[in-house]
């Protein structure tokens, strides 16, 4: 795993508290499952009908019938349960998921999220993201701060089709952590070795800076 991804995943793990029901989105968020510390008991949910996902299996121990929503092989923890999609989405839409950690393509300064398609490119579909951003109690997004062309993915307004409006509570990038309250974006943490000036330079969105960052 790249060092930048490791930093984001390890920071995302800090969002998980003992006793939570948590959904991990497809892609980088699924790596969080391997980093949950001993003694923190959570139930990880997948939209395809499993509550109680464990870490990725070791090579040679994979069960091809045991997969997550991204079709990756997984393990299960003691007490895991299986159910159909109707029950899975009833959990999500009914507000029974405490935290969803999702990937992102773009996030706006008001907390809008675009994470499901790029026009003109083949996509599998929306999946459960739209349900999660409206049903889960808390939404944390993890993504790289800029795209492969060096353009900011933290935007004034999202240019890609939205998954949800004003749904993001916290954004974790390889540069910084931002919180969203009442449509206002605030820089609350810097990743190691990153300066406020670098964040300004690589962020299209307008944002405030918390006193704790200014004092650090």
Curated annotation (Swiss-Prot):
Lineage, uppermost ranks: Bacteria, Bacillati, Bacillota, Bacilli, Bacillales
InterPro entries given in the database record: 3-oxoacid_CoA-transf_B, CoA_trans_fam_I, CoA_transf_AS, NagB/RpiA_transferase-like
Keyword Membrane: no
Reaction equations catalysed: a 3-oxo acid + succinyl-CoA = a 3-oxoacyl-CoA + succinate
EC number(s) stated in the UniProt entry for this protein: 2.8.3.5
Alphabetic keyword roster: Transferase
Self-association state and partner proteins as the record states: Heterodimer of a subunit A and a subunit B.
Protein name, entry field: Probable succinyl-CoA:3-ketoacid coenzyme A transferase subunit B
Family classification: Belongs to the 3-oxoacid CoA-transferase subunit B family.
Pfam family, one: CoA_trans
Catalytic residues (positions): 47
UniProt keyword annotation of Transferase present: yes
Matches recorded under SUPFAM superfamilies: NagB/RpiA/CoA transferase-like (SSF100950)
Coiled coil regions in record: none
PROSITE patterns: COA_TRANSF_2
GO molecular function annotations of the record: CoA-transferase activity; succinyl-CoA:3-oxo-acid CoA-transferase activity
């Amino acid at each position: 795993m790249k060092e930048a991804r490791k930093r984001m995943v390890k920071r995302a793990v800090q969002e998980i508290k003992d006793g939570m029901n948590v959904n991990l989105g497809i892609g980088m968020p699924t790596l969080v499952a391997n980093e949950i510390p001993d003694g923190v008991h959570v139930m990880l949910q997948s939209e395809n009908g499993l509550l109680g996902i464990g870490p990725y299996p070791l090579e040679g121990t994979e069960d091809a019938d045991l997969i997550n929503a991204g079709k990756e092989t997984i393990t299960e923890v003691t007490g895991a349960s299986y159910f159909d999609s109707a029950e899975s989405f009833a959990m999500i839409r009914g507000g029974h998921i405490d935290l969803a950690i999702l990937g992102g393509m773009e996030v706006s300064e008001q907390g809008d999220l675009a994470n499901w398609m790029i026009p003109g490119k083949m996509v599998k579909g929306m999946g459960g993201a739209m349900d999660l951003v409206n049903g889960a109690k808390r939404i944390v997004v993890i993504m790289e701060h800029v795209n492969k062309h060096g353009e900011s993915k933290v935007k004034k307004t999202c240019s890609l089709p939205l998954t949800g409006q004003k749904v993001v509570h916290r954004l974790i990038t390889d540069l910084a952590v931002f919180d969203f309250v009442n449509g206002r974006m605030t820089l609350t943490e810097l990743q190691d070795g990153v300066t406020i000036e670098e964040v300004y330079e690589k962020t299209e969105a307008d944002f405030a800076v918390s006193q704790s960052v200014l004092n650090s």
